Amino acid sequence: MTFSVQHAEIHFNQNHIPVSDQFDDVYFSNENGLAETDYVFLQGNQLWERWITHKEANFVIAETGFGTGLNFFAATKLFRKFRQQHENHPLKRLNFISFEKYPLKITALSQAHLACPQFEDLSAHLQRYWPSLILGCHRIHFEETTLDLWFGDVSENLPQLGDYMNERIDAWFLDGFAPSKNPEMWNDDLYNLIFRFTKPNGTFATFTAASAVRKGLESAGFNVTKRKGFGKKRECLSGLKIQSKSTALSTPWYLAQPAKMEKQDFAIIGGGIASLCAAISLVKRGAKVTIYCEDAALALNASGNKQGAFYPQLSDDNVLTVDFYLHAFSYGRQLLDWAIEQNIAFEHEFCGVALCAYNEKSAVKLTKISQLGLPNEIFQMLSAEQLSEKVGLPLNCEGGWIEQGAWLAPRQFVQNAFSFLEKQGVIIKTAQKITALSQEEKGWELKNMQGQKYCHEVVILANGHKITDFVQTEKLPLYPIRGQVSQIPTSENLLKLKSVLCYDGYLTPANQLKTSHCIGASHVRDNVDRHFSEQEQQENQQKLQQNIAQPWTQDVNTSDNLARVGIRCSVRDLAPMVGNVPHFEQQQAGYYNLFNLRRRKQPIQSAVNFQNIFLIAALGSRGLTSAPLLGETLASILYGEPLPISEGILHNLSANRAWVKKWLKGSKVE
């Protein structure tokens, strides 16, 4: 498996229009690209008129070729105008999904945007967050619009929208290079998928009027109309989906199901990074959020360390887990930038992360990572000399270098970000241990230890290893892991450490006061004791000194016995969980014979979940990296919006995945 994507090879013609060398075709009209976009795509899909009559909170556009982003800019600016003129309209958000096989280099993108100064603000934001060359979905937030930019071949990526996106897309911009130049893209499989994902009464528009395209879209099920073409083109096509076709779900046991709600009233149980990130994504959608934290203050458990590393987990044997972390890393950096822009104060340093090949096993893992085809800013192998230069201290081994890695202060980040959200209307209730959940007529009733009751439409469980304390979740295969992080004083040598250093543990650079470092962490499964352990304190020191056999490591001194213990939540396959809370008894009844149902090709029901209970769980030791994308994914599911992850990743993060894997093999689940 490789995640690499190839850049577009282009040149600019005499009209300053970008031209693809791969397809020998212009990115937009030589005459007036913006006018062409307006006529072919915006008017062709009757966007303004449809927005006026739209009854839902979001509208979804999908596009088959992002190119320079001109169509996206034009649609976003039109939607901005619509929102300004219709502030109280139910339509609040625009989701824009676009596929691009050959992304432009940032320099070419910047040059192409010079032709459209009216989009300067959108262009600057896009260029700031232009993704690294990694296969898959990259979500970028704009004020009015959410852009899901899928890098890679549309024929491979479009199916990854999956069962969840059946009949969820309102309009299509069928762009990309001309069918005569790019015949591989324009095919019946594409047309059938487009029809499948289009809502009833959804539309498409395209610049081409090629007979094969028209016939293919008609065969897929669209009513196709010829329109006058733009400029010198005689004709173009638009179409309408009038009748649906029944489509069998490919994986009904993993189908994500949105919340059923009227008031957007959410309770989030938990006071750490998972709760925070879910709350941020919900508040951006206008939700009413109440936080229930059992501790006296927020971020007192696994999210409470003074320093934590921010980097992706790339050494997993499951490629879907690696895929998730790559995109979580990119999205998480975007969230950190947002927090900084909001003046949310937290110590941090974008200093890079070094992964040491401290033994044969770790060297093999790093070699595997180096074969994933990742861009250098995400991962590159360096010699011991090169890595030592990055780290600032001598190392005796080669290793991996994550240029965009960082450290930050988790407790500061969580507490101060929640203070920011309080000003946005989020209600925070501390010292509130919720002991039971019961479904009532008006929603879910939450009962605390004192017998007080609260009622909310939707409940999100994000309380770490205590998620399984509830009847609804007690069967989930989660377990606690005790972790002790040591705090050590700095020294003249340790002050030279310029990046996070990872081995069979980790060591952070000095904090911003230049007084101390964090070193950790112990890993004790099925242990929830939060008392200090002298043995684990010594082990934290010994791991560094054994793995990195250099004189400077003798400066590490844990004898002050300053440490902090947190209890993390994990699962055997080490991937997090997000989405619906599965109803074990009903899924067991429906799927215990799943192996034979599939073999006999018999009908299989969709997964039965607890209505309006959701979770974010099993973040393990990578919560700083994974929580932002998990929170955004959950919010997208809750609101029935497009997801920022592929169907394959979603399945890999589903809470019932361990059960399903057994049922699919004909094995029992106890």
UniProtKB/Swiss-Prot annotation:
GO cellular component annotations of the record: cytoplasm
Keywords: Cytoplasm, FAD, Flavoprotein, Methyltransferase, Multifunctional enzyme, Oxidoreductase, S-adenosyl-L-methionine, Transferase, tRNA processing
Region (tRNA (mnm(5)s(2)U34)-methyltransferase): 1-242
Top-level taxon: Bacteria
Names of required cofactors: FAD
Keyword Flavoprotein: yes
A molecular function (GO) term: oxidoreductase activity, acting on the CH-NH group of donors
Record region (FAD-dependent cmnm(5)s(2)U34 oxidoreductase): 269-670
A Pfam family: DAO
Main location: cytoplasm
Subcellular location, record wording: Cytoplasm
GO annotation terms (biological process): methylation; tRNA wobble uridine modification
Entries under InterPro entries matching the protein: FAD-dep_OxRdtase, FAD/NAD-bd_sf, MnmC-like_methylTransf, SAM-dependent_MTases_sf, tRNA_MAMT_biosynth_bifunc_MnmC, tRNA_MNMC2, tRNA_S-uridine_synth_MnmC_C
EC number of the protein: 2.1.1.61, 1.5.-.-
Catalysed reactions listed for this entry: 5-aminomethyl-2-thiouridine(34) in tRNA + S-adenosyl-L-methionine = 5-methylaminomethyl-2-thiouridine(34) in tRNA + S-adenosyl-L-homocysteine + H(+)
Function recorded in the entry: Catalyzes the last two steps in the biosynthesis of 5-methylaminomethyl-2-thiouridine (mnm(5)s(2)U) at the wobble position (U34) in tRNA. Catalyzes the FAD-dependent demodification of cmnm(5)s(2)U34 to nm(5)s(2)U34, followed by the transfer of a methyl group from S-adenosyl-L-methionine to nm(5)s(2)U34, to form mnm(5)s(2)U34.
PANTHER family found in the cross-reference section: SARCOSINE DEHYDROGENASE-RELATED, TRNA 5-METHYLAMINOMETHYL-2-THIOURIDINE BIOSYNTHESIS BIFUNCTIONAL PROTEIN MNMC
Family in the record: In the N-terminal section; belongs to the methyltransferase superfamily. tRNA (mnm(5)s(2)U34)-methyltransferase family. In the C-terminal section; belongs to the DAO family.
Protein name: tRNA 5-methylaminomethyl-2-thiouridine biosynthesis bifunctional protein MnmC
Phylogenetic placement of the source organism: Bacteria, Pseudomonadati, Pseudomonadota, Gammaproteobacteria, Pasteurellales
Gene: mnmC
